[in-house]
Amino acid sequence: MAAESFYGTGKRKSSVARVWLKPGSGAITVNKKTLDDYFGRETSKMVVRQSLELTENVGKFDVFVTVQGGGDSGQAGAIRHGITKALLEADAELRGTLKKAGFITRDSRVKERKKYGRKAARARFQFSKR
């Protein structure tokens, strides 16, 4: 392999993203599609770019991502987490900046399971006194 690449795994909700950073022009590819083609919402695109913009590495790396599971929000968060981990592998001095922004910490919030005898995780069926 001629060019050096950096790898990071990111997780959020039920999404798992595998991220490779290679020195390049700044193209972001998600599941063999461009970022604009893969994500429709502007907020999802912004979340994906956040760690690169914070560390001023926007045009320095080409980002290749394979992401599975979850929805748009979870996948975007997983990609951001993976990019952050890959950036740390590339340059450990970025740790302080990324930690302060809260990008290194894995967001452990997941959907609460539905309980039996209830309509949802916490919602009850409608109660009638009479």
UniProtKB/Swiss-Prot annotation:
List GO terms (cellular component aspect).
Answer: cytosolic small ribosomal subunit
Does the UniProt entry include the keyword Protease?
Answer: no
* Pfam families registered for this protein in UniProt: Ribosomal_S9
Q: What molecular functions are annotated in GO for this chain?
A: RNA binding; structural constituent of ribosome
**Organism, scientific name:** Pelobacter propionicus (strain DSM 2379 / NBRC 103807 / OttBd1)
Record-level GO BP terms: translation
* Family as reported in the entry's similarity comment: Belongs to the universal ribosomal protein uS9 family.
Query: What keywords is this UniProt entry annotated with?
Result: Ribonucleoprotein, Ribosomal protein
- The identity of this protein, by name, is Small ribosomal subunit protein uS9
Q: Please tell me whether the keyword Ribonucleoprotein is annotated for this protein.
A: yes
Signal peptide, first to last residue: none
